[in-house]
Amino acid sequence: MGRSFEVRKASMAKTQGAKIKVYSKYGKEIYVCAKNGGTDPDMNLSLRHLITKAKKDQVPAHVIEKALDKASGGAGEDYQPARYEGFGPGGASVIVDCLTDNGNRTYQDVRQCFVKTGAKIGTPGVVAHMFDHQAVFQFQGDDEEAILEALMMADAEVTDIEHEDGVITVFAPNTEFFKVKTALNEAFPDLTLDVEEITFVPQNRTVVSGEDAEKFQKFLDMLDDCDDVQQVYHNADIE
């Protein structure tokens, strides 16, 4: 499909404050997932995936357990999802996903990130159509034909498979995430998935350079500092 999936692995947090932010975001997401779908990872597949992802990002076990205990208690905050869309510095498309217990506060916090960097927050749907909501898996390998055959045998729907420099990337509809993951694990028991996530993959990319590149990085840093922001998706190629 002519797309390249850019893997942005966040470097390990270098300061205690940065680590706490990562732990807090995972704790909130695990709490909401467990509260809505149950605290048993064997029954709640979304929770199982989230816990696996948290462990890969070195979130301590006590943070995960605290979120599960909080969800099982039935009390706690009532977080709701909120999504904001717009154009960042340099015109790149941006989607910001949040979990909030105060929608007005979250909107103002996110809006300030846009305003202070010359970005433009838009109406719902203004850029979502420029992204594909995909399940993405990435791992070391060279035999993409064997991967495709295994997925076809499992009747798993696949959007695209890319192979570059010894790395295979599988794209599938977001609804096929667990089916594709199960098929890969069963067909290739020794396979290590470096990336396994549901994300928004941009259909096209926008080059952001010079002063706009500096502003865009500041924009991302400001969003990262917002407690309610969980994920940021964009199509910027920052130079």
From Swiss-Prot:
InterPro entries (alphabetical): Integrase-like_N (IPR017856), TACO1_YebC-like_2nd/3rd_dom (IPR048300), TACO1_YebC_N (IPR049083), Transcrip_reg_TACO1-like (IPR002876), Transcrip_reg_TACO1-like_dom3 (IPR026564), YebC-like (IPR029072)
Which GO MF terms are attached to this record?
Answer: DNA binding
Q: What Pfam families does the record tag this protein with? A: TACO1_YebC_N, Transcrip_reg
> Known SUPFAM superfamilies for this protein?
YebC-like
Coiled coil residues, start to end: none
State whether keyword Transcription regulation applies. Answer: yes
* Top-level division of the source organism's lineage: Bacteria
Main localization category? cytoplasm
Where is it found, in Gene Ontology cellular component terms? Answer: cytosol
Disulfide pairs here are none
Q: Quick one: a GO biological-process term for this protein? A: regulation of DNA-templated transcription
Compartments annotated for it: namely: Cytoplasm
Keywords on record: Cytoplasm, DNA-binding, Transcription, Transcription regulation
Q: Which family does it belong to?
A: Belongs to the TACO1 family.
**Protein name as it appears in the record:** Probable transcriptional regulatory protein VC_A0006
Q: What species was this sequence derived from?
A: Vibrio cholerae serotype O1 (strain ATCC 39315 / El Tor Inaba N16961)
